[in-house]
Regions:
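ABC family nucleotide-binding domain
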Residues: 3-156
Length: 156
């Protein structure tokens, strides 16, 4: 059996809510995603889904517990290491995808790769391959503002 791509174990997270005191959002949460697995995280509003995903995506830190991406423990990683791992290994598709509407689908995919140090030709080739994979190769040069919501999600 392969190591999971993502493993969160015994995750605890609380927020200080001022006069209301401390609010415990996660209390011993466990979450595992195997490589290639598609997972839906479904729970009532306020249950801690976004907090759990922000911890999994290294956008937030747990008060305690273990966070591993591709077998690498990251709960004590430096900000720089968390940023490197997030850039290379983590992707989110938000309900609101935050694409740059004046840029093409290809440009929206190329820009973050350039920011991560990938050479332009390689970033363009990778963007084109990804667009082909999600059946948007013919729309690569179209501005995302001209695309449907579903097409925008696939670009994101």
């Amino acid at each position: 059996m392969n190591d999971p791509m993502l493993r969160l174990s015994d995750i605890h997270k609380s927020y200080n809510a001022g006069q209301a005191g401390e609010i415990r959002v996660l209390d011993g949460a466990d979450f595992t995603v195997d490589r290639g697995e598609i997972v839906a995280l479904v729970a009532p509003s306020g249950a801690g889904k976004s907090t759990l995903l922000h911890i999994a995506g290294l956008l937030d830190t747990a008060d305690s517990g273990t966070v591993e991406i591709a077998g690498q423990p990251l709960q004590r990683a430096s900000d720089a290491e968390r940023t490197r791992t997030r850039r290379r290994s983590v992707g989110f598709v938000y309900q609101f995808h935050h694409l740059l509407p004046e840029f093409s689908a290809r440009e929206n995919i190329v820009l973050p790769q350039l920011a991560n140090g990938m050479p332009n030709a390689q970033a363009v080739a990778r963007a084109d391959a990804l667009l082909d994979k999600v059946d948007l190769a013919k729309r690569a040069g179209h501005r995302t503002a001209e695309m449907s919501g579903g097409e925008q999600q696939r670009v994101a």
